[in-house]
């Protein structure tokens, strides 16, 4: 995954979003 959106994080919150 790159940043936000569920790319390889289906139903989960990626650290990119959580950190932003």
Swiss-Prot record:
Keywords: Adaptive immunity, Blood coagulation, Coiled coil, Disulfide bond, Glycoprotein, Hemostasis, Immunity, Innate immunity, Secreted, Sulfation
Domain of life: Eukaryota
Cellular compartments annotated: Secreted
Positions of post-translational Sulfotyrosine modification: 4
Swiss-Prot/TrEMBL GO biological process terms: adaptive immune response; blood coagulation; innate immune response
Residue ranges, annotated region (Disordered): 1-20
Coiled coil recorded as keyword: yes
Modification after translation, per record: Conversion of fibrinogen to fibrin is triggered by thrombin, which cleaves fibrinopeptides A and B from alpha and beta chains, and thus exposes the N-terminal polymerization sites responsible for the formation of the soft clot.
GO CC, one annotated term: extracellular region
Glycosylation positions in this chain: 2
Role noted for this protein: Cleaved by the protease thrombin to yield monomers which, together with fibrinogen alpha (FGA) and fibrinogen gamma (FGG), polymerize to form an insoluble fibrin matrix. Fibrin has a major function in hemostasis as one of the primary components of blood clots. In addition, functions during the early stages of wound repair to stabilize the lesion and guide cell migration during re-epithelialization. Was originally thought to be essential for platelet aggregation, based on in vitro studies using anticoagulated blood.
Domain remark from Swiss-Prot or TrEMBL: A long coiled coil structure formed by 3 polypeptide chains connects the central nodule to the C-terminal domains (distal nodules). The long C-terminal ends of the alpha chains fold back, contributing a fourth strand to the coiled coil structure.
Subunit structure of this chain's protein: Heterohexamer; disulfide linked. Contains 2 sets of 3 non-identical chains (alpha, beta and gamma). The 2 heterotrimers are in head to head conformation with the N-termini in a small central domain.
Protein name, as recorded: Fibrinogen beta chain
Native organism: Elephas maximus (Indian elephant)
Taxonomy of the source species: Eukaryota, Metazoa, Chordata, Craniata, Vertebrata
């Amino acid at each position: 995954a790159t940043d936000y959106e569920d790319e390889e994080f289906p139903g989960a919150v990626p650290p990119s979003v959580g950190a932003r």
